[in-house]
């Protein structure tokens, strides 16, 4: 970034965020290398046209660290992109400026709601579950093998079965997601 956060946190009260969520989402999209012509019109629907999907939920700071991704958050009715949490301070992006604020102030102003972006695997069209097959299921099997330190080839055309559902649920539990056994948003 051209304007790095200062070493010393600034009070959140002194920082002006965006009035609309779309502008903060555009800041997030810029981190993915995407810049829409009209930043206020950025939306999850537009992001999907370039293979990025939104995930919105409620979480705490520990989960934010586990996600290890920038997120859009609302603080005191203003929208920011949270790009980093580190030792008592949080880095917030507004347009091309990064502000460092005390985490305690962020917690006082934040409800826990957030939106993050994620890139869809090859062949992903919708959440995948029992009975599905195709490139997205093959990708999921390979990723879970890597995550679980397992080796071995997988044959294309793998069917999402009960065993894979258990692995997905285990992954969801360890990452703080709802363990529904469905992969995707």
Where are these regions (language model features)?
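Conserved active-site-adjacent core of cysteine acyl-enzyme catalytic domains
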Residues: 1, 7-111
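Acidic/histidine-rich, surface-exposed loop or edge segments in extracytoplasmic proteins
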Residues: 3-12, 116-127
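Extracytoplasmic/periplasm-facing segments of secreted or lipoprotein envelope proteins
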Residues: 19-24, 28, 125, 129-136
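A structural motif
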Residues: 111-120, 140
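Cell-wall glycan-active module
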Residues: 1, 91, 115, 135, ...
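Short acidic, glycine/serine/threonine-rich helix-capping segments at coil-helix boundaries
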Residues: 128-137, 142-185
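Surface-exposed beta-strand edges and their flanking turn/coil or helix-capping segments
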Residues: 105-107, 116, 131
């Amino acid at each position: 970034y051209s304007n790095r956060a200062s070493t010393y946190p600034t009070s959140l009260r002194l920082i002006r965020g965006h009035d609309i969520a779309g502008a903060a989402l555009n800041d997030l999209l810029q981190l993915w290398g995407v810049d829409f012509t009209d930043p206020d019109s950025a939306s999850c629907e537009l992001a999907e046209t370039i293979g990025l999907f939104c995930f919105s939920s409620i979480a705490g700071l520990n989960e934010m660290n586990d996600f290890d991704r920038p997120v859009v958050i609302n603080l005191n009715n203003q929208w920011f992109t949270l790009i980093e949490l580190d030792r008592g301070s949080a880095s917030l992006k507004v347009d091309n400026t990064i502000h460092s604020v005390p985490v305690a102030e962020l917690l006082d102003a934040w409800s826990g709601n957030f939106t993050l972006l994620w890139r869809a695997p090859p062949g992903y069209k919708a959440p995948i579950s029992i009975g599905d097959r195709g490139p997205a299921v093959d990708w999921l099997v390979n990723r879970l093998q890597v995550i679980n330190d397992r080796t071995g080839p997988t044959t294309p055309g793998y069917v999402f079965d009960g065993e894979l559902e258990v692995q997905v649920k285990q992954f969801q539990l360890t990452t703080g997601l709802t363990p529904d056994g469905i992969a995707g948003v």
